[in-house]
Design a protein with these regions (language model features):
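N-terminal, positively charged regions that mediate nucleic acid binding
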Residues: 1
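Alpha-helix N-cap and loop-to-helix initiation/capping positions
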Residues: 65, 92, 151-159
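A general structural signal for well-ordered alpha-helical packing
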Residues: 125, 129, 157-164
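Histidine/lysine/aspartate-rich catalytic loop segments that bind and position anionic ligands
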Residues: 140-145, 162-165
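Conserved C-terminal portion of the radical SAM core fold
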Residues: 159-176
């Protein structure tokens, strides 16, 4: 209950973004010539010891934004010639992201990428259906022992093993 305090994701009741900008160094297939319109959300439900965005994932860095402001950020990134809107580690903000996407969609003409750690619940994925064009999960662990030791998440693979087929069901196999 985030009304009573921060959750496992290190976040409270507001959307917090660490950075929103063109990002030319994402996976080459989504960066293109101008870069991916990347929104790095603060916080994360995983506790990976090797996280490359540790400051973003463990601390409430960045700025709080409203749903309307988030939708405006998506459109501004599109105006800057982003090849897509790349939502990085947004699972814990999904209800608000969905609202922002619904606000922006009439004017948004570039694909939406859900860039996640693969640890997505069916409820989250069902909320995103029809709004996300590309799922970009990182499949991190196979064994409960490894996931528990390195992410404090022993059920990681059992959750991801259900999430990834659902992602494929929604958007189909990748086309390069």
């Amino acid at each position: 209950d985030r009304e009573k305090g921060v959750g496992l994701c290190h976040c409270g009741t507001e959307i917090r973004i660490a950075r929103a900008a063109l990002h030319p160094w994402e996976e080459p297939c989504i960066s293109g010539r101008h870069g991916s319109g990347t929104v790095f959300f603060s916080g994360c439900a995983l506790g990976c010891v090797f996280c490359q965005n540790r400051k973003i994932s463990r601390q409430a860095v960045g700025k709080a934004v409203t749903v309307t402001q988030l939708a405006e950020i998506f459109l501004k990134l599109q105006e800057q010639q982003a090849h897509n809107i790349n939502l990085v580690t947004g699972s814990h903000y999904t209800p608000w992201i969905v609202q922002a996407l619904e606000l922006a969609k009439p004017k948004l003409h570039i694909p939406v990428v859900w860039n996640c750690g693969g640890y997505e619940s069916p409820e989250i994925l069902h909320m995103l259906e029809g709004l996300v064009d590309i799922y970009l999960p990182d499949l991190k662990f196979y064994t409960p022992e490894t996931a528990g030791a390195y992410a404090n998440c022993p059920d990681y693979f059992s959750v991801a093993a259900k999430a990834i087929p659902e992602m494929f069901r929604q958007v189909g196999k990748p086309v390069w």
